[in-house]
Amino acid sequence: INAVTQDLYLSDKSDQRLIVFDEAWQFLGESSTLKEVIEEGYRRARKYHGSFTIITQSVLDMKLFGGVGDVIRNNSAFKFYLESSDFEKALDEKLMDYDEFTMRILKSTKSNKPKYSEIFMDTPFGVGVGRLAVDPFSYYVFTSDASEITEIEAMVDGGVSYEDAIREMVKKYRS
């Protein structure tokens, strides 16, 4: 983490930097040092032509962040949400602050894999829902579905290249 933050704070400020913490909850367990790094990053990154991003499975994970969660929410100009059943609870727990109309839009967000995933976007320019649709090959390259990954890995273990395994998945499941 030192190398990452050093790169942000000491590098040429004309170069943009994006620091992403995927499954962010795991970084915030008992390590108060890492909490401080993330909190400082969310407060200062803009000054260095950088930004911090966290990815979690649920908006409710923000509770695990403690006070850092407030800093993250208050310093995040852009928020993106995929389909979830946690939105009402997050609203009740003050992890979100949307009016009834916006909540209806947020809760309407759906995923229809492998065809598309809808994404609710809360930006300085407004809120709304967009669709991410990818071609079938790209879908299987980036899938996080355990059964699909298992099927691809089984083909690879059987001597098929990843590319051919993915092409086979596309043929098998094309609808």
Cite the ranges covered by each PLM segment.
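Conserved P-loop NTPase motor cores
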Residues: I1-R104
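Conserved P-loop NTPase motor module
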Residues: N2-L10, S108-S175
